[in-house]
Amino acid sequence: MTHSVDAILDATGLNCPEPVMMLHNKVRDLAPGGLLKVIATDPSTRRDIPKFCVFLGHELVEQQEEAGTYLYWIRKKAD
């Protein structure tokens, strides 16, 4: 599926907790309703990023795995 994103966060090569910490900062800078694509290689993001979205009220639009790379599309909640 193709999504038109407003920002990209490349957390490739980073391990827990860095991807989620970076995600928190990136989402803070995103406009409400904005779409963020996250690229990660840490398998723990499969657990951590969906929980992050539920906890903070953001929408996890889609997630995919491609050869050890994890892709997430997150829509920031409206203020």
Curated annotation (Swiss-Prot):
PROSITE patterns: UPF0033. Keywords: Cytoplasm. GO terms for molecular function: sulfur carrier activity. GO terms for cellular component: cytoplasm. It is found in: Cytoplasm. PANTHER family: SULFUR CARRIER PROTEIN TUSA, SULFUR CARRIER PROTEIN YEDF-RELATED. This is Sulfur carrier protein TusA. It comes from Pseudomonas aeruginosa (strain ATCC 15692 / DSM 22644 / CIP 104116 / JCM 14847 / LMG 12228 / 1C / PRS 101 / PAO1). The gene is tusA.
